[in-house]
Amino acid sequence: MAQHDFAPAWLNFPTPPSSTKSSLNFEKHSENFSWTENRYDVSRRRHNSSDGFDSGIGRPNGGNFGRKEKNGWRTHGRNGTENINHRGGYHGGNSRSRSSIFHSGKSQGLHENSIPDNETGRKEDKRERRQFEAEDFPSLNPEYEREPNQNKSLAAGVWDYPPNPKSRTPRMLVIKKGNTKDLQLSGFPVAGNLQSQPVKNGTGPSVYKGLVPKPAVPPTKPTQWKSQTKENKVGTSFSHESTYGVGNFNTFKSTAKNISPSTNSVKECNRSNSSSPVDKLNQQPRLTKLTRMRSDKKSEFLKALKRDRVEEEHEDESHAGSEKDDDSFNLHNSNTTHQERDINRNFDENEIPQENGNASMISQQIIRSSTFPQTDVLSSSLEAEHRLLKEMGWQEDSENDETCAPLTEDEMREFQVISEQLQKNGLRKNGILKNGLICDFKFGPWKNSTFKPTIENDDTETSSSDTSDDDDV
């Protein structure tokens, strides 16, 4: 297994010149053995490998593996240790003790030669590893901060050159201290540390109290407090977040604002904490009130609009020639219908001008009600039929009115008979027909009778289309 397979890319060990000396020394001693020459050629080609070919062939029991990995992968004297192991590899086991089997004198010299190489490699390795740990984990050994950065020029990248190298090490230290303090002091609802300032919202759970970052313990080091707020500004609020598992960003923003005094920041934390749920509680009923009022207005407006349009259509109809049999019934209902119409007219004058294009309809309605005051007989049945037709998917199309043929007297009589039957039998309840009499009714004549005046009068056409659009919306 080659070393570069599992070593990270930033772990660059420059190969020291001592390993080349040991390999030259080994070349002198290995002239007598052909198999060692072959092996050395292989290992020279692959001098990076920590294991060579021994792990599979020479040492089936893996006797020296752990030790050799320590020397071969970690240290700089890789060639020395490898080549010793190749010499003794075929005889299995611990290569240092058995390296004198073949040609004991020469291999003894080789053994002595490579020992100091290994020791120096180990020392370098320890020093580099300590420096690496200190660089990446400054909170583990604070002495590293006072040492000058020696190795920063060797490797490049984010590991060695962070975006802000000056503030990096103290900031990481502050994180460590803050975390230990928080973990020691917080038995989860921490009310004592906040200088007896509980969260103002009484309904909020005690988790909110634990979310305040707790600089309220009187700060012994003002510099640490400043650096902590600086850390919050830079954006490392994840430390507090990971401690509590819940992120409350209002508190971090407020602590970042107040750098110098600690009590102000705690007050602001409490304020921001308590204000958000209170605002939410206040806003929700306000929203529901608005929507409720709007829906009520709209529904009432639509109801009034339906009533007025039904009256209009009936007036058009009765004006077309059906004023014969209505007098007796009209006298009976005239008072109530006039009152309804007055109420509706007042309501519409207040409401309808908010919608677009309906002012003409108001004026027309007023003119009509003054000219034909006694023609509101069939309003209830018409309203029911109209509602049913709309539920079945029929729409008022003012464009198709010109194609309709003029009404005949037979059609008008048929319509009157049906409507009178409906009213006498009392088959209408809540605006819904209970039996299928509406099926015998021909849609064409009713539609034509409704829209006959609109052919003569252009204003009526526009007003009816406007009302139908508003009603469909």
Swiss-Prot record:
Modification type Phosphoserine: residues: S49, S274, S276, S322, S381
Compositionally biased spans, kind Polar residues: 94-117, 193-204, 248-286
Location of the protein in the cell: Nucleus
Tissue: Ubiquitously expressed (at protein level).
Superkingdom of the organism of origin: Eukaryota
Chief subcellular location: nucleus
Alphabetically ordered keywords of this record: Activator, DNA-binding, Methylation, Nucleus, Phosphoprotein, Transcription, Transcription regulation
Signal peptide span: none
Compositionally biased spans, kind Acidic residues: 456-473
InterPro entries attached to this UniProt entry: Vasculin_fam
GO cellular component terms attached to this protein's record: cytosol; nucleus; plasma membrane
Bias-annotated ranges (Basic and acidic residues): 119-133, 293-329
Molecular functions per Gene Ontology: DNA binding; DNA-binding transcription factor activity; RNA binding
Modified residues (Omega-N-methylarginine): R87
Chain residue ranges for the region called Disordered: 1-25, 44-170, 186-341, 450-473
GO BP terms: DNA-templated transcription; positive regulation of transcription by RNA polymerase II
Annotated family: Belongs to the vasculin family.
Assembly, per entry: Interacts with GTF2B, GTF2F2, RNA polymerase II and TBP.
Function (record text): Functions as a GC-rich promoter-specific transactivating transcription factor.
Entry protein name: Vasculin
